A protein has these predicted regions:
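Donor nucleotide-sugar binding loop of glycosyltransferases
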Residues: 12-15, 38, 68, 97
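Short beta-strand/loop segment that forms part of the nucleotide-sugar
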Residues: 28-39, 58-61
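Acceptor/aglycone-binding surface of glycosyltransferases and processive sugar-polymer synthases
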Residues: 64, 70-81, 98-179, 183, ...
Length: 242
């Protein structure tokens, strides 16, 4: 099964190079970096890192940032246009470890699953330096998802996932809607996978927040972005969005 990992990148100076350098041979067939607002220092860091690995790296650049959902969709478009059958999505800031990709792809390749969610909270998972308020939210939010979808979830906000590309081509799944340009996309796809009968499982992964200073560990702002994260579940459940 031809595989690709999509990594959205936005000003990950000093981080994206380390992420690339941790890739091991044969984990995936292709790495696709989607870079918003590229600057020379980021390009240089990526070029230096890609020399140290054997996995081919494709780069898509956006002069203006349009949102993480938009960036991931560009990766989807590339993957679908080039015949990739298995898609992995992960962070470009070092929170996710590329060496754990087989934990997500093996259930698809060998056990017949369609969609694999990485979880820091199932046995074997690990989390480090998670900000306190965020930790409280990410533990409580899956309870709501479980109640509304009927599928047990432990780590809905973890963006480290793998799934068959056929999910993206399902006519019941419309990832190209404009309202999915930002964080909504990931939760939209998660809801669709859980409610349309796809074979779903969680597998243990690590999640490490590299910085403890205010605003230094993530581009997400709780006050600004909370509805982009929470909204899709309720909008889809109520039928306000499709």
């Amino acid at each position: 099964m031809k595989s690709i990992v999509i990594i959205p990148v936005f000003r990950e100076i000093g981080r994206i190079g380390r992420v690339l350098s941790r890739f091991e041979d044969s984990q995936v067939d292709q790495i696709c970096l989607v870079i918003d607002d590229p600057i020379p220092i980021i390009r240089q860091e990526i070029e230096e890192a890609r020399k140290t690995i054997k996995t081919p790296v494709t780069i898509i650049e956006n002069p203006v940032r349009k949102g993480i959902g938009h960036a991931i969709r560009q990766g989807y478009s590339y993957a679908l246009s080039n015949g990739y059958e298995l898609v992995v999505v992960m962070a470009g800031n070092g929170k996710d470890d590329p060496r754990e990709i087989p934990r997500l792809t093996t259930p698809i390749l060998k056990q017949g699953f369609d969609y694999v969610q990485g979880s820091r909270y199932v046995r074997g998972g690990r989390h480090d330096k998670n900000p306190f308020i965020r930790s409280a939210f990410v533990r409580m939010f899956p309870v709501v998802w479980t109640a509304l979808t009927g599928v047990r979830c432990s780590d809905v906000t973890n963006g480290f996932r793998a799934y068959k590309a056929s999910l993206l081509k399902d006519p019941r799944v419309n990832i190209w809607q404009d309202w999915l340009d930002r964080y909504q996309l990931e939760y939209y796809l998660h809801y669709k996978a859980l409610t349309l009968g796809y074979r779903f499982v969680e597998r243990p992964v690590s999640k490490t927040y590299p910085f403890r200073n205010k605003g230094g560990y993530s581009h997400i702002s709780p006050m600004r972005d909370w509805w982009q994260i929470v909204g899709p579940l309720f909008l889809l459940k109520m039928g306000a969005k499709d």
